[in-house]
Amino acid sequence: GQRRLLVVLEGASLETVKVGKTFELLNCDKHKALLLRRGRDPGEVRPDITHQSLLMLMDSPLNRAGLLQVYIHTQKNVLIEVNPQTRIPRTFDRFCGLMVQLLHKLSVRAADGPQKLLKVIKNPINDHLPVGCMKIGTSFAVPNVTNLRELVPIAEPVTIVVGAFAHGSVNVDYTEKMVSISNYPLSAALTCAKITTAFEEVWGVV
């Protein structure tokens, strides 16, 4: 029951598509015609949201201090555990390549050892969260704004669910409460940055 923050990036748009002989990560810019042919809204296919959010989370002092654990749950119901040691590729193209590898091989190992940096794990997410830990969803639709610092527990773990999709609100069945953290709609990446900053301030991580 020691203190740490668990973040679930919910509804992430991570799926592969076969183009010629290779697989690519489906995205709205590169595969617009293909998406329209399949009757899908390209505006919803936004893996860049997950990429930007992961950069914010994994680069944070909170993560460097060993107080953060990140999970990704995709629109296709794939659950991914992100090892805190993972260095997320800076460029979107390289991130896409990494995700294709992960989705097909179910894990990605470190270049310099046997350690798995990213791995697909069994649903549901609840099986992987600390027993009895508070689970909070974030949504712009909640009327009253909560000061993030008030959500930071003194000494126990807490889970915060952040929507990694373009439009809509987090709608999962395992959160105990929903909070809004700003009077303005925030991007997922900015939400992640604000959350980690609040936890760093309260827990004295500088």
Segments from the language model and where they lie:
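Surface-exposed beta-strand edges and their flanking turn/coil or helix-capping segments
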Residues: 20-22, 85, 150-151, 175, ...
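Structured adenosyl-cofactor binding patch, chiefly the S-adenosyl-L-methionine
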Residues: 166-206
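RNA substrate-binding interface of SAM-dependent RNA methyltransferases
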Residues: 1-144, 200-205
